[in-house]
Amino acid sequence: MNDIAVITIRIHPDLLSVQRARLEEEIRVFDGVTFARFNHGVKHWLNVVYNPKSVTSKIILKRVRKWDKNAAFF
């Protein structure tokens, strides 16, 4: 059975759409990440689905904080 975890990370709302797209791409390259997209209703929430045996939420958040040092789990 595959392990699956889901997290939502709050990013600064002023991040440009091109920056959000780039950030999604950067998160998707992690081994174990199957989904990384910004929420269509709340544009500053990044939803990530991943296998916690392959990558941790802390590693994902660390990468997101390169774009927004105040990013946090929601």
Where are these regions (language model features)?
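Conserved short beta-strand edge segments in small beta-sheet-based binding/regulatory domains
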Residues: 36, 67-74
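A generic structural motif
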Residues: 44-49
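Short acidic amphipathic segments
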Residues: 15, 24-40
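Short glycine-/aliphatic-rich beta-strand segments at the starts of folded cytosolic domains
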Residues: 1-14
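Helix N-cap motif at beta-to-alpha junctions
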Residues: 50-55
